[in-house]
A protein has these predicted regions:
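Active-site phosphate/ATP/adenylate-binding loop shared across adenylate-forming ligases
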Residues: 2-33, 37-38, 43-229
Length: 229
């Protein structure tokens, strides 16, 4: 691919990504004008949908209506959910969510031991809804981003992906690629806009992973954005 054609392709891909994000960005701006009502409605929907789960029954979700009501649910940390997540991993349903758990996503483990976070289809959709206005605002605030490529690192594979309990897990452990956080069109665009091949995520050795990532980044002359979550 010639340098000129590559630049035109990158510009076109970035412009298409911005165009795809604009409706979601506009809806987000509208929602910011009535934050309390939007958040209250979302909370009610979550409580209603999960009122019959083990967690929902334990905390009487069917009797909660407002954010103030929800204050009766005690603060917790990850250890409080370890047994429930273990049950989900062995195939139990309706534990924390009424919706089926699509996968358990490991955290990076940079500050504490790696955790397994249950992801449902709705949660993945909410991530996509949150990413869309963020991407649009980046492009609008920094138009020069349209001229180059991006590097995103959400869940780097700098640790062995599996644990003993993962071997017989009834639920998939981990996204195959960070682009799964995105919508279908955006995932297709990442193939052109991300300089580090998705296959690098399959490298399990931390030093090799970091070396190969750095190698591809150093080769990219038009890198405009680095986003590490």
């Amino acid at each position: 691919m010639s340098s000129f054609f590559k630049k035109i392709s990158v510009l076109a891909a970035n412009c298409l990504w911005l165009a795809v994000c604009m409706p979601g960005w506009a809806l987000f701006l509208i929602a910011t004008r009535r934050v309390k009502s939007v958040q209250t409605a979302r909370l009610r929907r979550i409580l209603r949908q999960n009122s019959k789960t083990e967690f929902g029954r334990r905390h009487r979700f069917d009797s909660l209506r407002t954010p103030e009501d929800y204050l009766s649910v005690p603060l917790t940390d990850y250890e409080d959910y370890a047994t429930a997540i273990g049950a989900i991993q062995t195939g139990h349903a309706n534990v924390l969510t009424a919706e089926p758990v699509e996968l358990l996503q490991p955290t990076s483990g940079s500050t504490t031991a790696s955790k397994r976070i249950p992801y449902t289809r709705s949660l993945q959709s909410e991530f996509k809804e949150a990413i869309v206005p963020w991407i649009a605002s980046l492009y609008l605030a920094r138009p020069s981003l349209l001229l180059g490529r991006h590097y995103w690192s959400i869940s780097p594979n700098t640790e062995p992906v599996s644990r003993p309990e993962d071997t017989h897990s009834r639920v998939r452990v981990g996204f195959a690629d960070d682009s799964e956080y995105l919508g279908t069109i955006q995932r297709l665009l990442t193939r052109l806009l991300f300089p580090v091949p998705s296959e690098i995520s399959q490298v399990r050795n931390p030093r090799s992973f970091e070396y190969l990532t750095l190698l591809f980044l150093c080769r990219e002359r038009d890198l405009r954005l680095i986003s590490v979550w």
